[in-house]
Amino acid sequence: MRIEQELKLGFKDVLFRPKRSTLKSRSQVELTRNFTFKHSGRQWSGTPVIAANMDSVGSFAMAKALSEHGVMTAVHKHYTVADWAEFIKENDASVLKNAMVSTGTSEADFQKTKDIMALTDDLIFICIDIANGYSEHLVQYVEKVRAEFPDKVISAGNVVTGDMVEELILAGADIVKVGIGPGSVCTTRVKTGVGYPQLSAIIECADAAHGLGGRIIGDGGCSCAGDVSKAFGGGADFVMLGGMLAGHEESGGEVIEQDGKQFMKFYGMSSQSAMDKHSGGVAKYRAAEGKTVLLPFRGSVHNTISDILGGVRSTCTYVGAAQLKELTKRTTFIRVQEQENNVFGKE
């Protein structure tokens, strides 16, 4: 047993220190990033925010809506090959280039991914997703997928430390997904005692990834636009959002009426709700590690994503970053014990 004494930080522990800026307006800030990925050599241009691969967020409808903003969607893995064929038939490359094909690590998952990717050359992203990215099985699976798809962009996770980021990149991942337990409907930290404060995880993992020419996704922990900016400021190349994009008509969640008001069900992918739906219940050897909540129905996602991106632009103006890629270089975080004045409640 050993104890690390260094303090690790979450988004609530810091604020940006404002800096002199020559920008006159938020409209001058460029959020588009251009990436060339390490192993695949693929190029991608867009706004590096990703809707999470949860079946009450990462739907086909979400992918179509967010592509209008240049934003990506990690489409959840529970669509069938036939579902994908229909989606591909109805949408062009401008939508498909922003859709990630999510997969687990079983042999059936591998075959399904091959079948989906064979439908079109316009799909370029594969998201390999398991809860515990520290498994040697994941490293071996990344190697297998890389051998099968040498020209596709592969994301793999989730992990929270630089050593595992490096191992996954060396195995063939272009992008590593960072985050264990910070999500709004994730209870892994409570059920297992395992986790890592998200901002420190991003800072440390970004350093490891960038040293090898890889990229990271900050996955989870964001509850407001300011948190998204903090993730970018900490070095995240992409930021993945679940709860902030849940509850919309494009989210794919179940709509429930109570007392004349509409709500949408939102749940973690290791929750009892998810396992009842997709796995026939919680296996005897495991515990559910997610919660189920009802969110007030929020209408179209277009207003929400515009508000989030507007907040990130505003952050950039406060620190003098004319482009999103400059934000981390312009970032100085100050440690704080307060974030906002809640005398009239939270927004």
Swiss-Prot record:
Gene3D superfamilies: Aldolase class I. Its EC number is 1.7.1.7. It comes from the Bacteria. It is an enzyme of class 1 (oxidoreductase). The active site is at 186 (thioimidate intermediate). It catalyses: IMP + NH4(+) + NADP(+) = GMP + NADPH + 2 H(+). Belongs to the IMPDH/GMPR family. GuaC type 1 subfamily. NADP(+) binds at residues 108-131, 216-239. It holds the Pfam family IMPDH. This is GMP reductase. Homotetramer. Catalyzes the irreversible NADPH-dependent deamination of GMP to IMP. It functions in the conversion of nucleobase, nucleoside and nucleotide derivatives of G to A nucleotides, and in maintaining the intracellular balance of A and G nucleotides. GO terms for molecular function: GMP reductase activity; metal ion binding. K(+) binds at residues 181, 183. One of its GO terms (cellular component) is GMP reductase complex. Keywords: Metal-binding, NADP, Oxidoreductase, Potassium. GO terms for biological process: purine nucleotide metabolic process.
